[in-house]
C-alpha cells in the first residue's frame, strides 16, 4: 500500500481510498470421484500462488456418485442448496456472480484463463473493508468465535455477513479419499504435457491415493443468504459495525481434522444482488494459543510443492520436499510417512 502525504483537507479522503482492499472469493465445486477435478485443484493452486490473500478459495465437495466425508462436511457447512444449482464438476463461482466458470479454463475451452475473470473482479471497488479476529471459545478447542468489523465507505445497500470455517491438509488412507485422475494417461497431449500446472498429473496414477485436500469447508453460518440482523438495515458511510459469530470443528463427522490448519472466512453478502461484495480470510490460532487478527497477520501458507530436482508435485511425497510459501519464501521439509 502506498503512503501518501497530503494536506489536511484531503487526508481523510486519501486514507479511505487506500484502505479499500478488494478480495475475490472463489467457491470451487469438486469431488474425489470426479476425474477432471484435478484440473480444478491445479487451478486453485496456481491462482492462490498468483494472488495470495487477495483470492479466498473455498473448495466445496459434492457427492459425484457416493457421499464422502468432505461432501458431508460441505453440506453441513451450509453449501447444500448452492451445490444443487451446480451441474457438473469441476466448476466455480467468483463472488457468486451469475455465471458458473471452469476453475482453470475460466470462460475458455482450454488453457489457464481463470485469471482473466479474477482480475475483472479485483478491479471492482468494494463498498466496505473487513477486519476480523478468531479465537477459541472453549478449553477443548472445539468451538471458535469470530469477531468482525465492517467499515463502510458508502451509505445505503442491504448487506449481511456470512461465515465459513475451512480446513487444510485433510487426508485419509481409505478408498473414499482417493482422487480420481483422468489426466494420468495424457502425457502425449501437447496441451497438457506443456502446461506446467497440469503436466504433473500425467505422472500420477488413475487414483491418487495420498492426496492432501485444502480449503475444505467444515462449518458455516449463514452461508447461503447471510445472517439476518448481522448488519443494520440502514448503512451510513464512514460507520463501523461489529458482529460476532461462532463455528465449531466438526470432528463428529471427521475426527482427524487438524486444528492447526483452520481458517475463518467472513463474506459480505449484498442482498440486492445475491453476490459477495468483499470478504476476509484469517488463520484460526493453533489450539491453546491467543487469537489472530486480520489477514495481514496470518501465517504464510503452502502454495506449491517441489521435489529436490525441481519437479512440481501435486502433493508432498515421502522424503525431502521443497515448499513454496505464500510470502515468497521456500522451505525444505522431510516427510517420513
State what each model feature region is.
Residues 320-337:
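C-terminal tail/sorting-segment detector
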Residues 10-18:
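Hydrophobic h-region of N-terminal signal peptides that target proteins for export
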Residues 56-288:
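Short, conserved sequence motifs used for protein processing/export or organelle targeting and
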Residues 34, 92, 289-296, 310, ...:
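Terminal processing/anchoring signals of secreted or surface-associated proteins
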Residues 20-60:
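Local sequence-structure signature of Cys/Sec-based thiol-disulfide redox active-site neighborhoods
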Residues 1-5, 337:
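Positively charged n-region of N-terminal signal peptides that target proteins for export
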Residues 23, 298-301, 317:
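Short, small/polar residue-rich loop motifs at catalytic or cofactor-binding pockets
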Residues 281-309:
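Residue-level detector of functionally pivotal "anchor" positions at catalytic/ligand-binding pockets or at interdomain
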Amino acid at each position: 500500500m502506498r503512503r501518501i502525504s497530503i494536506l489536511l483537507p484531503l487526508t481523510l479522503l486519501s486514507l479511505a481510498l487506500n484502505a479499500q482492499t478488494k478480495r475475490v472469493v472463489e467457491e470451487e465445486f469438486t469431488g474425489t470421484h470426479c476425474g477432471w477435478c484435478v484440473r480444478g485443484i491445479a487451478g486453485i493452486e496456481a491462482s492462490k500462488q498468483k494472488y495470495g490473500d487477495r483470492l479466498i478459495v473455498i473448495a466445496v465437495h459434492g457427492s459425484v456418485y457416493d457421499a464422502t466425508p468432505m461432501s458431508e462436511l460441505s453440506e453441513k457447512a451450509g453449501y447444500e442448496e448452492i451445490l444443487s444449482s451446480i451441474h457438473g464438476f469441476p466448476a466455480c463461482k467468483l463472488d457468486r456472480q451469475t455465471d458458473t466458470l471452469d476453475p482453470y479454463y475460466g470462460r475458455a475451452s482450454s488453457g489457464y484463463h481463470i485469471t482473466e475473470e479474477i482480475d475483472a473482479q479485483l478491479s471492482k471497488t468494494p463498498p466496505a473493508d473487513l477486519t476480523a479476529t478468531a479465537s477459541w471459545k472453549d478449553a477443548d478447542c472445539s468451538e471458535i468465535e469470530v469477531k468482525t468489523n465492517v467499515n463502510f465507505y458508502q451509505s445505503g445497500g442491504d448487506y449481511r455477513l456470512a461465515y465459513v470455517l475451512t480446513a487444510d491438509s485433510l487426508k485419509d488412507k481409505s478408498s473414499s479419499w482417493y482422487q480420481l485422475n483422468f489426466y494420468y494417461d495424457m502425457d502425449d497431449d501437447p496441451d497438457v504435457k506443456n502446461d506446467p500446472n497440469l503436466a504433473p498429473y500425467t505422472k500420477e496414477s488413475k487414483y491418487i491415493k495420498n492426496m492432501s485436500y485444502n480449503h475444505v469447508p467444515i462449518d458455516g453460518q449463514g452461508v447461503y443468504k447471510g445472517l439476518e440482523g448481522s448488519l443494520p438495515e440502514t448503512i451510513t458511510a464512514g460507520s463501523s459495525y461489529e458482529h460476532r459469530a461462532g463455528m465449531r470443528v466438526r470432528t463428529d463427522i471427521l475426527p482427524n481434522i487438524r486444528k492447526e490448519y483452520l481458517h475463518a472466512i467472513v463474506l459480505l453478502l449484498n442482498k440486492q444482488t445475491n453476490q459477495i461484495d468483499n470478504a476476509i480470510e484469517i488463520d484460526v490460532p493453533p489450539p491453546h494459543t491467543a487469537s489472530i487478527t486480520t489477514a495481514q497477520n496470518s501465517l504464510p501458507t503452502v502454495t506449491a510443492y517441489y521435489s529436490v530436482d525441481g519437479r512440481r508435485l501435486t502433493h508432498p511425497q515421502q522424503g525431502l520436499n521443497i515448499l513454496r510459501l505464500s510470502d515468497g519464501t521456500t522451505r525444505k521439509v522431510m516427510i517420513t510417512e
